[in-house]
Amino acid sequence: MQIGVVMGGVSTEKEISNLTGKYIIENLDKSKYEILPIPINTKFELIDKIKCLEFAFIALHGNFGEDGKVQALLETMGVPYSGSGVLASSLCMDKNMSKKILQGEGIKTPRWIMLYKNEDIDFESIKNIGYPLVVKPNSGGSSIGITIVKKEQELIKAIEEAFKFDEEILIEEYIKGEEITCCMLDGKPLPILSIKTKEEFFNYKAKYFEGVAEEKVADLSLELKDQVEKISNKCWKSFKLKVYGRIDMIIKGNEVYVIEINTLPGMTKYSLFPKSAKAYGLNFSELLDKIIELSIKEYEF
């Protein structure tokens, strides 16, 4: 089978996408697949590069990759692809919409308000959230543009930083607790990972540089483990996720807060998903086989 690994892209996460793509190419079984690297530098070249593919393994992150646009293009052209569909990708990329759905499903998520570029800032609502708080772009990932603001004097600088990456940003309640992630494969939870970082939070540096964060199987009580898995399953169904995904959470006391849902989790050497799969008993090559197998079943045109 011919597998095109679509990588690069046009978002701020291009560098990470290239790392993901490279690691996927290195670990795909060469005896099973004819592997074609598909580097993307502009939106327009994608159509020519993917039209003859038997299968597209999407290694893109951020806008025009993780937001449903590439998925829609592939579906239109009849090319099967890895991961979730158009709707799930679009919803999970929009943190504001995601949080509204989480709220509607009775799943805890930090309180938040939205700010829009070139509109007045609602300082009173921000004050009601309280400090410390988190300022982040509404779309995008890899923790790019995120700042933890401890006091009011730091707020404007953090807002300006987030607006460099998006026209819409979130001001979010800061939840101090244990950072965990639940990777899902075919709708089933893999071992839950606990994240301990030397940084202030699980930021870009902690995610992609060796030795900055320690991720290991979480030592949770049976009750908490069950709660996390139930929440993850509910997220999977509510957002119509397919094949694989990752739900990032924080545990505070006995309460679990969903921070965000990733439809195309990072697949670099240091990424969480391969580590969780390894703890389950799947090496990276086997994980890639499983993603391809499940995706083809899911997207039969």
Curated annotation (Swiss-Prot):
What's this protein's family per the entry?
Answer: Belongs to the D-alanine--D-alanine ligase family.
Q: How is the cofactor bound?
A: Binds 2 magnesium or manganese ions per subunit.
Query: Which molecular-function annotations from GO does this UniProt entry contain?
Result: ATP binding; D-alanine-D-alanine ligase activity; metal ion binding
Question: Where's the ATP-grasp domain?
Answer: 99-293
User: What is the uppermost EC class here?
Assistant: ligase
Q: What GO cellular component is one of the record's annotations?
A: cytoplasm
Q: Which cofactor does it need?
A: Mg(2+); Mn(2+)
GO terms (BP aspect): cell wall organization; peptidoglycan biosynthetic process; regulation of cell shape
Swiss-Prot/TrEMBL keywords: ATP-binding, Cell shape, Cell wall biogenesis/degradation, Cytoplasm, Ligase, Magnesium, Manganese, Metal-binding, Nucleotide-binding, Peptidoglycan synthesis
Write the lineage as a comma-separated list: Bacteria, Bacillati, Bacillota, Clostridia, Eubacteriales
Query: What does it do?
Result: Cell wall formation.
Q: Where does Mg(2+) 1 bind?
A: 248, 260
Q: Which InterPro entries match?
A: ATP-grasp (IPR011761), ATP_grasp_subdomain_1 (IPR013815), D-Ala_lig_Van_CS (IPR000291), D_ala_D_ala (IPR005905), Dala_Dala_lig_C (IPR011095), Dala_Dala_lig_N (IPR011127), PreATP-grasp_dom_sf (IPR016185)
Q: Which HAMAP family match?
A: Dala_Dala_lig (MF_00047)
Q: Where in the cell is it found?
A: Cytoplasm
Pathway named in the protein's UniProt entry: Cell wall biogenesis; peptidoglycan biosynthesis
Catalytic activity annotation: 2 D-alanine + ATP = D-alanyl-D-alanine + ADP + phosphate + H(+)
List the protein's name. D-alanine--D-alanine ligase A
Q: Which superkingdom heads the taxonomic lineage of this protein's source?
A: Bacteria
Query: Gene encoding this chain?
Result: ddlA
Q: What is its EC number?
A: 6.3.2.4
Is Thylakoid there in the keyword field?
no
The positions annotated for binding ATP are 126-181
Gene3D superfamilies in the record, alphabetically? 3.40.50.20, ATP-grasp fold, A domain, ATP-grasp fold, B domain
